[in-house]
């Protein structure tokens, strides 16, 4: 696996990986697939201090991605970021998530980040386990906040102090 900053040419692969998680109702609150055009503003909104990275497999294909995003958009929160990790279906369960989260924890202090947060559905046990394994703790809970297919789901906020 090779990690590098995302480039415009990666947008379709990033969106395809994102869309592959929608049907499970475990990862994102989007309920229908999105297009690269739908995600262009989000993609372009990544900056030097809040970047988007892609992980390439040995064949140079985008296998996963990590996004650092501004939390809440107020100056007092500038040292806090939300981290998101998305992994291609073929690469799940193979340690890619651990690799990406370790890289995120390594990179974040260089971006001026002191606190990392992740928003994870309460029923997404694999993601909760991954983040907890890497020192994240539950910082908050929004009970029943998401409704998909007539069912309500909790959203957990996990966080970790880096310094």
UniProtKB/Swiss-Prot annotation:
Sequence positions that bind acetyl-CoA: 85-87, 94-98, 124-126
Recorded GO MF terms: acyltransferase activity, transferring groups other than amino-acyl groups; phosphinothricin N-acetyltransferase activity
Domain N-acetyltransferase: 1-158
Annotated disulfide bonds: none
GO biological process: response to antibiotic; response to herbicide
Family membership: Belongs to the acetyltransferase family. PAT/BAR subfamily.
Protein name according to UniProt: Putative phosphinothricin acetyltransferase YwnH
């Amino acid at each position: 696996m090779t990690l590098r900053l995302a480039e415009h040419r990666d947008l379709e692969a990033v969106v395809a990986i994102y869309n592959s998680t929608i049907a499970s109702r475990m990862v994102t609150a989007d309920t229908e697939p999105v297009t690269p055009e739908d995600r262009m503003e989000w993609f372009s909104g990544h900056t030097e201090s809040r970047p988007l990275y892609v992980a390439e497999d040995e064949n140079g294909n985008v296998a996963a991605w990590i996004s650092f995003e501004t939390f809440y958009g107020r100056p007092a929160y500038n040292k806090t970021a939300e981290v998101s990790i998305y992994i291609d279906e073929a690469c799940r369960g193979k340690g890619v998530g651990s690799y990406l989260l370790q890289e995120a924890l390594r990179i974040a202090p260089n971006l001026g980040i002191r606190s990392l947060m992740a928003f994870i559905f309460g029923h997404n046990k694999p993601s909760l386990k991954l983040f907890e394994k890497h020192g994240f703790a539950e910082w908050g809970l929004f009970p029943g906040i998401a409704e998909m297919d007539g069912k309500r789901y909790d959203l957990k906020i996990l966080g970790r102090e880096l310094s």
